[in-house]
Amino acid sequence: MGRKRLITDSYPVVKRREGPAGHSKGELAPELGEEPQPRDEEEAELELLRQFDLAWQYGPCTGITRLQRWCRAKQMGLEPPPEVWQVLKTHPGDPRFQCSLWHLYPL
Amino acid sequence: MFSEQAAQRAHTLLSPPSANNATFARVPVATYTNSSQPFRLGERSFSRQYAHIYATRLIQMRPFLENRAQQHWGSGVGVKKLCELQPEEKCCVVGTLFKAMPLQPSILREVSEEIIPPVSAFQHNLLPQPPRSKYIHPDDELVLEDELQRIKLKGTIDVSKLVTGTVLAVFGSVRDDGKFLVEDYCFADLAPQKPAPPLDTDRFVLLVSGLGLGGGGGESLLGTQLLVDVVTGQLGDEGEQCSAAHVSRVILAGNLLSHSTQSRDSINKAKYLTKKTQAASVEAVKMLDEILLQLSASVPVDVMPGEFDPTNYTLPQQPLHPCMFPLATAYSTLQLVTNPYQATIDGVRFLGTSGQNVSDIFRYSSMEDHLEILEWTLRVRHISPTAPDTLGCYPFYKTDPFIFPECPHVYFCGNTPSFGSKIIRGPEDQTVLLVTVPDFSATQTACLVNLRSLACQPISFSGFGAEDDDLGGLGLGP
């Protein structure tokens, strides 16, 4: 007997051809050289913002935007890191930057 | 003082009409500023948790408490966080109190479907708890919470008196059982106060609360009309009219409508029975509009909403909408203000509420006297510590507006069972007049505050009712 009939048998089988080095994403790298660097920087900035969210000194982070939380911490004299404000100012309107870590969860 | 002034003038009633009529100009309000801006809400968003209020409350109050702790227990006392506590080491901790009360009404307990026999005597799983006047119990426990941890408290701390949400500093040490043994504790005490400029003439502010319109009782309507007549100078001799001209402002502190206007029987009835009936509050608001028209034609009036008034339920209650008072809003002397109301009248700072904060603390604390509770809120430096826990509150996130930024000169609360007034002193020579304004529909009493001497006097209006047997004493009986 063959193997059990799976629902995926009704779909055509498509196998991706692996590149010689084993990675298929690496093809784009030599053509557009700037992409990985901004991504790394962005990742570093997002990581900075995530650490700001998780810092307990500035109060709860859910339900308010990071900018609101930073301004509240500033008004209360808690001296939040100015780098966070710089990052928030350079990416206005981007929900990955502006909203807190848990904004996808209701309340 | 009011009636003594009145008695000094010559009697002019019961005399033939005179050619010239005496006129009394009302004392002008020299300076008035409404500082209730922190209690005004613009865009409201309820998609936030209440953790923000508690966090900002603790962060804002921490410096005050650390100062007081150093004043009480010496400047060398170590103020530590709960995570830094070492066993058996005496130190001071600042945090928010939480009182675990088994009798506290809990919606989860009400809707829980467990039919397991209750473990403790006071778990009613099947029936909702009937409303009680006090929810305290000898088994209540106090827990201190700071930003990261919580710890149970035991020792010389009055569990029944304190309520959830108070920020305080405790001095003691943590024991082996994990509880903190309290030796002493202190509150933030009174905020700094700017001295009031001295006044040269007597000026009065009339505080009334609990008019209770729409309640169906004719007694209180007579009292209300007498009040309006006295203030507008239509009652009494020239002496009384002269004294009434010294009343520079009237503050109506909440519960303008009666509790019975809130009855929701029409919800349970069928639609065809209730189609043409109006809500009871509509008629009551019309009566209120007429009373406010008479008052605001003569004196500046500030109207604060209360528990039964048509505005939002959560604190801070927003001002009543001017569309409900088409007649009275024609006068600019009518001011519709928020529930915790703050204003500076002739240099004297007034701060007051309609009484929801004090009655909520009354329910969850062993303190019996409303005046004592009012003083306690001032000493704790917070208008309503139970606010998000048992009293509805807007989810603030930036600041907690109920913390006293500075100490008022007159601090009042409305809708208390009886009149009371007291002058208290603070540690930095602050002087505050505390006034508990009684419910007018029950007691027919209002309060007159003298701005020059910061003294308060009750003034009561009563008519002879059918059940009064005082008529016998007047010699009118058979």
UniProtKB/Swiss-Prot annotation, chain A:
Disulphide bridges, residue numbers: none
Effect seen on changing K89R: No effect on ubiquitination. Loss of ubiquitination
Start and end residues of each stretch annotated as Disordered: 1-44
Effect of T8A: Strongly increased stability following UV irradiation
Comp. bias (Basic and acidic residues): 15-28
Keyword terms, alphabetized: DNA damage, DNA excision, DNA repair, DNA replication, Nucleus, Ubl conjugation
Subcellular location: Nucleus
Any Pfam family hit: DNA_pol_delta_4
Induction statement: In response to DNA damage, genotoxic stress and replication stress, following UV irradiation, ionizing radiation, treatment with methyl methanesulfonate, hydroxyurea, or with aphidicolin, protein expression drops to undetectable levels, due to proteasomal degradation. This down-regulation is ATR-dependent.
Gene Ontology biological process: DNA synthesis involved in DNA repair; DNA-templated DNA replication; positive regulation of endothelial cell proliferation
Impact noted for substituting K15R: No effect on ubiquitination. Loss of ubiquitination
CC annotations in GO: delta DNA polymerase complex; nucleoplasm
Superkingdom of origin organism: Eukaryota
Sequence motif PCNA-interaction protein motif (PIP box), location on chain: 1-16
Post-translational modification: Ubiquitinated; undergoes 'Lys-48'-linked ubiquitination in response to UV irradiation, leading to proteasomal degradation. This modification is partly mediated by RNF8 and by the DCX(DTL) E3 ubiquitin ligase complex (also called CRL4(CDT2)). Efficient degradation requires the presence of PCNA and is required for the inhibition of fork progression after DNA damage.
Function text: As a component of the tetrameric DNA polymerase delta complex (Pol-delta4), plays a role in high fidelity genome replication and repair. Within this complex, increases the rate of DNA synthesis and decreases fidelity by regulating POLD1 polymerase and proofreading 3' to 5' exonuclease activity. Pol-delta4 participates in Okazaki fragment processing, through both the short flap pathway, as well as a nick translation system.
Similarity comment: family membership: Belongs to the DNA polymerase delta subunit 4 family.
Subunit structure: Component of the tetrameric DNA polymerase delta complex (Pol-delta4), which consists of POLD1/p125, POLD2/p50, POLD3/p66/p68 and POLD4/p12, with POLD1 bearing DNA polymerase and 3' to 5' proofreading exonuclease activities. Within this complex, directly interacts with POLD1 and POLD2. Directly interacts with PCNA, as do POLD1 and POLD3; this interaction stimulates Pol-delta4 polymerase activity. As POLD1 and POLD2, directly interacts with WRNIP1; this interaction stimulates DNA polymerase delta-mediated DNA synthesis, independently of the presence of PCNA.
Protein name: DNA polymerase delta subunit 4
Organism: Homo sapiens
